[in-house]
Amino acid sequence: MVRSIMLLALFLAIKVSAQEVGSFYEKNTALNFNDGRNIAGEIAQPSGFNPNFHIYLCFGQSNMEGNAKVEEQDFMGISPRFLMMAGVDMPNTGRKEGKWYIAVPPLCRAWTGLTPADYFGRTMVDNLPDTITVGVINVAVGGASIDLYDEDKTDSVIANSADWFKGFCKDYDNQPLRRLMELAKKAQQVGVIKGILLHQGCTDNGQKTWPSRVNLIYTRMLNELGLKAEDVPLLVGELLTKVDGGCCYLHNSIIDNIHDYIPTAYPISSLGCPGKPDKLHFTAEGYRIIGKRYAERMLQLLKY
């Protein structure tokens, strides 16, 4: 009886958190997290292959996409050694898909906000030798299940989704993983992919098959790009915790054990990262904190 009650409570918690994700976007169909700021970042195309150009691939759902308004401080002090490759055209700034720019936010799409990738990159260049440049490529879709990035399931995921979700996917020609892979291959012509950052899970909250699905996608990415897992770790950020007001915190117990399923995957704690009232997303300060934590873990793995 007690077990049945516990299972029912778990099911209801998972169901409610998934509903929270859909409800957020249904209520916020036109989001703009950098109103009035049309800063593209200086164009910074690498002249040729450089082994000291370290590249990181970033993917996931809305917290990787960036769901907090970019604040004045976030436009300041960005090193010319921290670059972003545009994953889509950004008409408001003139950024072009596949081109490199100084990493002025937004790093994902034209109207997205601050992401973990922002302060990941800033912290990396602050702690690496001056000879090393860091580049990020961010392809993320708000509301996405991890299955969106499984190309055997992408079409069905999109077909069975709400119109707002289809609109996000259309920015990537309905093939977000394919877009990320195409950009990654282009990036390999000028630098070395050193790691992959994932922040995803609200839509899949509590699903025990999630690690194996992540592993499938991670393995496919490595194989297609000719990379070895021991050289390219997967960093997986926790969701907003229960203590910090999150509604999808059940998934953190799964993320925290990701290393048991994928030996080269490492969880990134979100404890103490402030959250927004929607219970799904971090505040700008929360993104700054967790972004730094991604970097701190990567620096440890690089032995810096």
Residue ranges: model-predicted function:
Residues 19-304:
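Cell-envelope and extracellular/periplasmic
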